[in-house]
Amino acid sequence: MKTLREHGRYPYSSITQRPGFAWPQGDGLAVYIGLNLEHFAFAEGLGGELVPSTGLAPDVLNYAWRDYGNRVGAWRMLALFESLDMPVSLLVNASIYDYCPEVVTAYRDSGAEIVAHGHTNSEKQGDLTESEEAAMIAGVSRRLTDAEGMAPKGWLGPWISESAHTPDLLHEGGYTYFLDWCHDDQPVWMRTRGGHILSVPYPQEVNDIPAILVRRTSAETFADMIIDNFDEMLDQ
């Protein structure tokens, strides 16, 4: 029989057969609020859709819906997070710094952690050659380092897209963790050609775009899903 291709990044491990897991402070559960701050090219490249595109360019409706998030939605959410004293992990396209840097500044001033999220969500990382991808990662790192005064350590790929070399390139670029893989409830060390990088879970079930736009979940049900996920993870 044909041998199936494997990724070779980590071995199989049943969560029921592992030793007890605890964070350095002794806590059993860690929570992060991941807020994606994304910028898209106008009338070219990829983009999330509120409604199916007509195929005619420019697709003003869907572009404007995405831009609403940077102009209005991000500010409404910042006010909510601050009212709840809730820290945020801000997953930032590097092109945001050229478009609306004041949004990043406001979140940074509120105590948000800045996580690299590629250059733009108008392109998929996995479509690049290895040299193109390495150059993109390096460019994003330089842009965030210049803006934040420190090199980013975490990464989420645009569209959660990877090439076969992405973990290797991220490790070589100085990243210590990334969020692309949703294969576990616990952080998992993944092999690269130069060492290890930590995979931090990024659960798709409580991601608003798949839940609300794809599966047509109501806002109330989505909120219940987040609460139920937290309660179940805490119980486990």
Model-assigned labels for residue ranges:
Residues 2-198, 222-236:
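Catalytic alpha-helical scaffold of carbohydrate-active enzymes acting on polysaccharides/glycoconjugates
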Residues 185-187, 199-221:
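Positively charged, amphipathic and often flexible ligand-engagement surfaces
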